Curated annotation (Swiss-Prot):
The organism of origin for this protein: Aeromonas salmonicida (strain A449)
Protein's name according to its UniProt entry: UPF0246 protein ASA_3634
Family: Belongs to the UPF0246 family.
Entry GO CC: cytosol
HAMAP family for this protein: UPF0246
GO biological process, one term: response to hydroperoxide
Length: 257
């Protein structure tokens, strides 16, 4: 069973590391090609393309300029420790054991606009390049065309290495669009999290993102390897709803307090 999650815009390169081991990203040649293209953008162009402030655009122009192919602990950080956002609040890796990191390294992948696919211990330099960014490049008009089948092939290889064929989709729509279902050698299962508001259950982005992280943590902490085991997820008030679930969707709901 392989889990995919989205990255986060917010990064943390300051907090003490809870693990010193690291690995190298596996798609750096592709990343370097994107960096070469991104370096052609002025801060004003970055601000317009990414719809961010001038200050953030300047920061990311500097990050593109400083990026280098040689990753080491002095200029990079393990991806699972670098990302900070709602999903990663739910993952809460601060108390992960060595065994937890080992299981995560085998079963968790982070999709990325710049790095394609990252394993938890893969080093990454700071960046901002969301998968939905319409950055024209040598392979097409946006990052989906740039990555093409590369991400899907990489996921297929990871599934084959596990001897498994189940992909647990805990990523956002923006990022999961980089995976091509028809080329995927496996079954996609998507947990959905709905919260009650004013008597109606709906997907509330902030809560859903955190819940995806909590589900990933639950799988890692309990070493789950079968889809059926996910139905036991009952963290933070969520409960499984079998009548709204099927072979491809697992529905979880949480009642209003």
């Amino acid at each position: 069973m392989l889990i995919v999650v989205s990255p986060a815009k917010t990064l943390d390169y300051e907090s003490p590391l809870v693990i010193s081991r690291f690995t190298q990203p596996q798609l750096l040649d592709h990343s370097a090609e994107l960096i070469t293209r991104a370096r052609q953008l002025s801060p004003d162009q970055i601000a317009s393309l990414m719809k961010i402030s001038d200050k953030l655009a300047g920061l990311n122009a500097a990050r593109f300029a400083q990026w280098q192919h040689d990753f080491h602990p002095d200029n990079a950080r393990q991806a699972l420790l670098a990302f900070k956002g709602d999903v990663y609040t739910g993952l809460a890796v601060e108390d992960f054991s060595d065994g937890d990191f080992d299981f995560a390294q085998a079963h968790l992948r982070m999709l990325s606009g710049l790095y394609g696919v990252l394993r938890p211990l893969d080093l990454m330099m700071p960046y901002r390049l969301e998968m939905g960014t319409r950055l024209d490049n040598s392979r097409g008009k946006d990052l989906y065309q740039f990555w093409g089948d590369v991400i899907t092939q990489h996921i297929n290889a990871a599934l084959t290495a596990q001897g498994d064929e189940v992909l647990i989709n805990l990523a956002s729509d923006e990022y999961f669009k980089s995976v091509r279902p028809k080329a995927l050698k496996g079954r996609i299962v998507t947990p959905v999290f709905k919260d009650e508001k004013n008597g109606q259950f709906k997907i509330i982005s902030f809560y859903a993102k955190k819940a995806r992280g909590m589900m990933a943590r639950h799988i890692i902490k309990h070493r789950l390897t079968e889809v059926e085991q996910l139905t036991g997820f009952n963290v933070d008030g969520y409960y499984f709803v079998p009548e709204e679930s099927d072979a491809h969707t697992l529905m979880f709901k949480r009642a209003e307090n």
